[in-house]
Amino acid sequence: MAESYLLDKLKSVEQTFNELTRRLGDPDTASNPDEYQEIAKSRSSLEEVVNTYEIWKTAQEDLIGAREVYKESASDPELQEMASLEVKELEEKIEHLESRLKVLLLPRDPNDEKNIMLEIRAGTGGDEASIWAGDLMQMYTRYAQTQGWKVSLVSESRGEMGGWKEVILEIKGNDVYSQLKFEAGVHRVQRVPATESGGRVHTSTATVAIMPEVDDVEIHIDPKDIEMTTARSGGAGGQNVNKVETAVDLMHKPTGIRIFCTEERSQLQNKERAMQILRAKLYDIKLGEQQAAVTSMRRSQVGTGSRSEKIRTYNYKDNRATDHRLGQNYSLTPVLDGDLETLIQSCISLDQQERLAELATSAAN
């Protein structure tokens, strides 16, 4: 591997991995379940890097041997040809392993493993924008189902002609944030609305926010900053309807963020859910400030997650979904049916390429 900074990093990771392995075998560690679990998790996060590095080192040794055989077999054309093929195969294998190692060494987003709050807000376009927000909600729900994730409706404000003015979903599962974080931004649709009698194509938008779930340790909220009122809910049917004040209207005074929760069956549950959404929103603001500092130095093609950033256009007439960051078109129907995997992986790959280029540049300076 030509890049010495990567070799140094790999050696450091290997040393850390070996030390963590040693500590796991220490009786003192085994007697402390919390410490043992934390060390085991840290070790597990390095395991793929170390295993790939070991395969790379073995391949390097094999390559040295194959080149030696090639040099010494000048008098045996058949053996030399076999050695030549082995050299080529090993060089390709090493190149692939080095590419993989570079990706594995990229700093991992600490939020990648988290569950999320997915918020969709109708933008420009009136009733059609609300209907479009509903279509996006269905798209993400279907994608989540293909991933085996659990989707729950936590807050909603329905549109007059269907769809939602605003809807918040909670999505739980493995690595949800890592898969969906690049979906944040403005989603534009071009189509003839169901409400359009003249057959004219309209352009409407909806804004998607992807917020990692956080606990009260990560985001502290002063109770004095909260103003809460209750209301009667028309939610869960039966004798509760319009008789018990289960709905919660919560205002965070410093930011002006307002959350109205009616989906749970009790006032306490709705209050807890509203606080959960508020923590996610405040953390999202904090993340946005951090990302703004980074992107002031480097403009990311894959996107900053800004709510004002147009990331995709869905054209019904041409059955085409265009991702503006990737500069690629996709068939619209499968995308709306939740077939987002290729698109999402392309965004992840683009982000990795950008960060690798940045890493190489910083190492050269």
From Swiss-Prot:
Post-translational modification: Methylated by PrmC. Methylation increases the termination efficiency of RF1.
GO molecular function, one term: translation release factor activity, codon specific
Cellular component terms (Gene Ontology): cytoplasm
Compartment(s): Cytoplasm
Primary localisation category: cytoplasm
Keyword flag Transport: no
UniProt keyword terms in alphabetical order: Cytoplasm, Methylation, Protein biosynthesis
InterPro entries: PCRF (IPR005139), Pep_chain_release_fac_I (IPR000352), Pep_chain_release_fac_I_sf (IPR045853), Prokaryotic/Mito_RF (IPR050057), RF-1 (IPR004373)
PROSITE patterns to which the protein is assigned, alphabetical: RF_PROK_I (PS00745)
Domain of life according to the entry: Bacteria
Modification N5-methylglutamine occurs at: Q239
Annotated stretches, region: Disordered: 21-42
Database matches in Pfam families: PCRF, RF-1
Purpose: Peptide chain release factor 1 directs the termination of translation in response to the peptide chain termination codons UAG and UAA.
Family, as annotated: Belongs to the prokaryotic/mitochondrial release factor family.
Protein name: Peptide chain release factor 1
Originating organism: Nostoc punctiforme (strain ATCC 29133 / PCC 73102)
Name of encoding gene: prfA
